[in-house]
Amino acid sequence: MTTPPVYAVGDIHGQFDMLQRALRQIEKDGGTDAKIVFLGDLVDRGTGSRQVIECLIEGQARGRDWTVLTGNHDDLFVGFMDSGAVHDPRVKSGVPWHGPRIGGLPTLASYGIGGLDRDPAALWDDARRAVPPEHVEFLRDLPSHLLSGDLLFVHAGIRPGLPLEQQNRDDMMWIRGEFLEDPRPHPWLVVHGHSAVEIAEHRGNRVNLDSGAGYDRPITAAVFENGGVWTLDAFGRMPLEPIDRQTM
């Protein structure tokens, strides 16, 4: 029995032009009715965060079969918009949201906010006027995951060994080591981003589609169909085979 393909797009990080390229690749392969899951981290670092959010809102409004998941960067942006907070205890390094490592300032600049070297309180005051409330609510309401058959789409990963109903939303946005280093099979093939790699990886129990758009590397789009996994480029599908566990 064949099942319809499901497409996924890795971390976007404000790279609007790259997002458009990924959407063209998907449309070429699956048409305008393609089911697409966006794995979160829509904002920060790149210059087009506003355009990315607008594109996804408009696509859903047109009836596209698009599911947009939340990422930790999206959650940090909502936190800033709610309270002006630039520090979050979940950021273990302690670096602020508006600093270069997390990359919040380009997000504000995409909304026309200038004077980015000002105090965060002044930036927050401008942001509350410049950022449409519907953008904040869109990000706030994003789901943490999507289960589609034997595929689990999520931004960062899951806590191994826990059933889905016991998974923590913060883990799904933030987890790394405990998930990435566990080679055991999960009940599903987990499709995630969050932890940047040079190119997409299939690790047998998980597929990582964060190919580093936050560091000016290309966004990865992939297709999952009848147990197979392919990445997409301008020429079509490229098989993404599991890496031998001995190399993990």
Which residues fall in each region the model found?
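Short, glycine/charged-enriched secondary-structure capping and boundary segments
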Residues: 21-24, 51-54, 82-85, 167-168, ...
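A general structural motif
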Residues: 3, 31-34, 63-65, 149, ...
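N-terminal active-site segment of His-dependent metallophosphoesterases
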Residues: 1-55
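Residue-level marker for buried hydrophobic side chains located in beta-strands
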Residues: 8, 36-38, 68-69, 152, ...
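Active-site environment of divalent metal-dependent phosphoester hydrolases
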Residues: 13-17, 44-47, 73-78, 160-161, ...
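Active-site neighborhood of divalent metal-dependent phosphoester bond hydrolases
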Residues: 46-141
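Acidic, His/Gly-enriched loop-helix segments that form or flank divalent-metal centers
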Residues: 102, 106-208, 212-218, 224-240
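Intrinsically disordered, low-complexity terminal extensions
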Residues: 37, 230, 240, 244-248
